[in-house]
Amino acid sequence: MKALHFGAGNIGRGFIGKLLADSGMQVIFADVNDSVIDLLKSRRSYGVKIVGDSINTVERVTQVTGVNSKDETAIITLFNEVDLVTTAVGPNVLKIVASTFAKALEARIAGGNTKPLNIIACENMVRGTSFLKEQVFTHLNPDYKDKVEQLIGFVDSAVDRIVPPVKPDAEDPLLVTVEEFSEWIVDQTQFKGAIPDIKGMELTDNLMAFVERKLFTLNTGHAVTSYYGKFKGYKFVKESIEDESVKAFVKSVMQESGAVLIKRYGFDPQAHAAYIEKILKRFANPYLVDDVDRVGREPLRKLSYNDRLIKPLRGTIEYGLPNDNLIRAIATALSYRNENDPQALELAKSLAEAGVTQTIKKYTELQDENVIARIAKAYETL
């Protein structure tokens, strides 16, 4: 089997691409980074360093090559040849690749290819593949829409693996370092044709429970560790979470967001408490050097209505659950400053010019005046 994977960055190589290759697939990475693509084409393999309490080893990933995703003709040709398409490009890039996907699907169908094809976006967002499908359909010729609905599966997924950036290795410049833990859960109800047998890909018919469990716990906790750690003067996630006051705050935030999950999906409280502890331990992994600015980047996206801070807060409001720590976490996110991050600069500018209340309303889209006032007060008393 052959897979086309968009995004040859650390997540693509260290997580999704590795699982596909480990399952015997030939993996073609598509990316705009010429140097990475040239290395993939010439070396046809790379190393993945897996680190944790009980493991510190390098595994080779083979049967890989690359294509420049700006080469639309090559991408369209590959869409007709492959059995699976995956992405790990970041939520903002899905809009950009959608027009190429539309052209490629039109060409595949126009050429008489009636084999089903599944597309899985492996992004840090809720129902990222459904979003990609919407974007693709805005570019799709109406004459092809019925056939695309019939033959192309747009499969939502939840992904979880911490893959921090590392300095390139001189001998193996494609080497990527990852934590031992990984989780890739896909919505089995959305596949067309046979579901591919991929080691490490779990199937579920209740994906939203796992999407929100990850978003409300790993993503919420990671962001809060970053924002509060930065606020306290730390540079790395590991040193932030080793500060007992940071750890206690992050845990209390995850407990509040966890109460929403328990109420909404019936998760076992003890099992979820253990899941929180496992995540706190992952943040403290001594082998992962993860910068708070990498984790905290794009604060406006992370403060948006359906993302890791506001969505769990909305759940606490819906169910009448405690949320003092989530309120404080959002206030801490508002304090994030980074001269190299356009969103952080925009956030600081809005706070200075429009004030905290209008900034909260604009970027979070919250309507509840009392909740907005509580966030504003928490921000002003940081």
Curated annotation (Swiss-Prot):
GO terms for biological process: mannitol catabolic process. This is Mannitol-1-phosphate 5-dehydrogenase. It is an enzyme of class 1 (oxidoreductase). NAD(+) binds at residues 3-14. It comes from the Bacteria. InterPro entries: 6-PGluconate_DH-like_C_sf (IPR008927), 6PGD_dom2 (IPR013328), Mannitol_1_phos_5_DH (IPR023028), Mannitol_DH (IPR000669), Mannitol_DH_C (IPR013118), Mannitol_DH_CS (IPR023027), Mannitol_DH_N (IPR013131), NAD(P)-bd_dom_sf (IPR036291). Belongs to the mannitol dehydrogenase family. GO terms for cellular component: cytosol.
